[in-house]
Amino acid sequence: EGLMRTVIKNCPIALENPEDYDARANLMWASSLALNGLTGRGKQGVWSCHPMEHELSAFYDITHGIGLAILTPRWMNYVLSEQTVGKFAQFARNVWGIVEQEEEVAAKKGIQALYDYFVACGIPMTLPEVGIEADKFEEMAQQAVDHSAIAEKAYVPLDAADIAAIYKDCLTESQFI
């Protein structure tokens, strides 16, 4: 959560002033910690968005981070359930500072905050904006299942139909609250 707050604080500063050494250093430090495996210690499973995005990057020439930004809020919304609502409400409260007693409302506000943040950073937020249409969704979804443990070991296991549905959700702009 602290790493996410660091990125949320420093990314707009670095975008506004690319010469801001402190903002860039904080982003690099947060990125290093996020990617070195430390944050996953003691946790099980795979994060579903990575294998889903790997297929977008394999089939189309897009940046991994942009694909993740497009997918993540839609994935969160798709898997939002009694099983996940507590974790997503915690994300909303601890990362975004959302004050909301109702768990589902807090979770949806957190998902919306993430989506709006990506928009504010100037990130394309639909697949058509990065040149991806629906014609290969089923094939990419099956590849995501075949090339990962997403169907068995993910936080919320997903099959190819689930993944194709998430891709479809990424065709248009979204509202979560």
Locations of the language-model features?
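Active-site segments that bind and position negatively charged phosphate/pyrophosphate groups
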Residues: 1-113
